[in-house]
Amino acid sequence: MKLVQDKITIITGGTRGIGFAAAKLFIENGAKVSIFGETQEEVDTALAQLKELYPEEEVLGFAPDLTSRDAVMAAVGTVAQKYGRLDVMINNAGITMNSVFSRVSEEDFKNIMDINVNGVFNGAWSAYQCMKDAKQGVIINTASVTGIYGSLSGIGYPTSKAGVIGLTHGLGREIIRKNIRVVGVAPGVVDTDMTKGLPPEILEDYLKTLPMKRMLKPEEIANVYLFLASDLASGITATTISVDGAYRP
């Protein structure tokens, strides 16, 4: 059984890491997938990789400025107009920052909040415009275990992800009357480019504290997205699912 057969799906941050793993998994399960990336070059590279893996499937790609509601709405609207609807929006794009409170700059803090919180808000807002009349849809937001427990390695990232969790829970309660579900996923330490970009000493400390003695694979997070986007999760909304291997920052 293909869990998301013919579901029109957009994945931000879909060119690598968790987002790219989700794109592959959703295609394999019958979805019509569009990916958003940071640059058009990055998007084109990912599209070429997906075309090689799934030559019979059409995948669309865009590189909107996620901090601009108009830019995100234009890209989301293009997808919805082409297929006649939007079923699943996965707001997965984000950046990290590892400055502690006493050293974080105002500019860096504003930047991570703009991308990680405003970017998710803009994606959710745009998706809602395409889902509200049909009274159906699922919005999935990537949070983080650090948004629940905080982190000693930095203040900006966990603050932004706590914002994503608050947005998810509040929006989920507000728009369930339109039969639109909103769910967060809070990964632990995942083996992605973002994690590999951490300072070696921080990554080493992370690995020492992992109860599973390994980082999670992007596919393990994508599996949860697939379930949440499917009709099997029809009763789940306004909550955040932790996929953290018992890790606590």
UniProtKB/Swiss-Prot annotation:
Keywords: Lipid metabolism, NAD, Oxidoreductase, Steroid metabolism. The active site is at 157 (proton donor/acceptor), 161 (proton donor/acceptor). GO terms for biological process: bile acid biosynthetic process; bile acid metabolic process; protein homotetramerization; response to bile acid. The keyword Flavoprotein does not apply. Pathway: Lipid metabolism; bile acid biosynthesis. PROSITE patterns: ADH_SHORT. It comes from the Bacteria. It catalyses: a 3alpha-hydroxy bile acid CoA + NAD(+) = a 3-oxo bile acid CoA + NADH + H(+); choloyl-CoA + NAD(+) = 7alpha,12alpha-dihydroxy-3-oxochol-24-oyl-CoA + NADH + H(+); chenodeoxycholoyl-CoA + NAD(+) = 7alpha-hydroxy-3-oxochol-24-oyl-CoA + NADH + H(+); deoxycholoyl-CoA + NAD(+) = 12alpha-hydroxy-3-oxocholan-24-oyl-CoA + NADH + H(+). The direction of reaction is pH dependent in vitro. At pH 7.3, clearly the reduction reaction is preferred with an order of magnitude higher velocity than the oxidation reaction. At pH 8.7, the velocities of the oxidation and reduction reaction are comparable. At pH 9.9 the velocity of the reduction reaction is about 60% of oxidation reaction. NAD(+) binds at residues 15-18, 38, 42, 92, 161, 190-192. Substrate binds at residue 144. GO terms for molecular function: 3alpha-hydroxy bile acid-CoA-ester 3-dehydrogenase activity; bile acid binding; NAD+ binding; steroid dehydrogenase activity, acting on the CH-OH group of donors, NAD or NADP as acceptor. Its EC number is 1.1.1.395. Induction: Induced by the C24 primary bile acids cholic acid (CA) and chenodeoxycholic acid (CDCA). SUPFAM superfamilies: NAD(P)-binding Rossmann-fold domains. It is an enzyme of class 1 (oxidoreductase). Belongs to the short-chain dehydrogenases/reductases (SDR) family. There are three genes for BaiA proteins: baiA1 is identical to baiA3 and encodes a polypeptide sharing 92% identity with baiA2 gene product. PANTHER family: 3-OXOACYL-(ACYL-CARRIER-PROTEIN) REDUCTASE (PTHR42879), 3-OXOACYL-[ACYL-CARRIER-PROTEIN] REDUCTASE FABG (PTHR42879:SF2). Involved in the multi-step bile acid 7alpha-dehydroxylation pathway that transforms primary bile acids to secondary bile acids in the human gut. Catalyzes the oxidation of C3-hydroxyl group of CoA conjugated bile acids generating a C3-oxo bile acid intermediate. Can use choloyl-CoA, chenodeoxycholoyl-CoA, deoxycholoyl-CoA, and lithocholoyl-CoA as substrates with similar efficiency. Highly prefers NAD over NADP as cosubstrate. Also catalyzes the reverse reactions; in vitro, the preferred direction of reaction depends on the pH. Homotetramer. This is 3alpha-hydroxy bile acid-CoA-ester 3-dehydrogenase 1/3. It comes from Clostridium scindens (strain JCM 10418 / VPI 12708).
